[in-house]
Amino acid sequence: MDAWEVVDRTPDMNVIDSIWAFKLKRFPDGMIKKFKARFCARGEQQLAGVDFFETYAPVVQWTTVRLMLILEILLNHKSKQGDVTAAFLHVELEEDEKVYVKMPLGFRKKGKVLSPKKMLYGSRHSPREFWKYLSNAMVACDMQPSRMDPCLFVGPKVLAIAYVDDILFWAKDEKDINDLAIRLREQGLLLEQEDDAAGFLGVRLSYTSDGKIEMKQTSLIDHVIETLGLDTKMAKSKWTPAEQ
């Protein structure tokens, strides 16, 4: 993706460290989906006003997520899930936000550093710049951000919400979602589509036979219990209002 170039290190450079971040990506039921290794910049070492200026990036509100799931039921819409591959690397780095990064472990060369051409994971302003990129791509495809929630995009036939690189789409006809996905790819977005929305941000979505959508976090609860070393037989449990 032509993300950086190797340059000579000079005394006036503010060079920040880099790390490898290893992560398991899981399905909503907790099963392992893929192993990920990501090269990241140590953003906490960036200098405000020198390496970056603004960092705020909106994310979809959970009230909006719940509202859209309710509309899916009431309007009998189809839903599909999308994920943007290497999201931050879509964004070209502006010259006034130039940052230099140490080469990753295993590839270091004496006197050499990386000069990123694209936004790197870990950079303080990467989320903001990607949100602007995604928003512009949506607008170019006739998807307008809502005034109530800028991460809710409303189009002639499709509705979408975005939480950084995770996107949910809704439409009466699945073909309209597929057509929008094609247009977004034409805008340069590396968008992977999945089947019906099975989960979002760690919450599992289950569709019942009587037309309801259940939201569960069983895998997260099990992970917390395991991490804390709790005995489920000894721990006291409480019913949620929805289960009573």
Place the predicted regions along the sequence by residue.
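Long, low-complexity, charge-biased intrinsically disordered regions
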Residues: M1-Q244
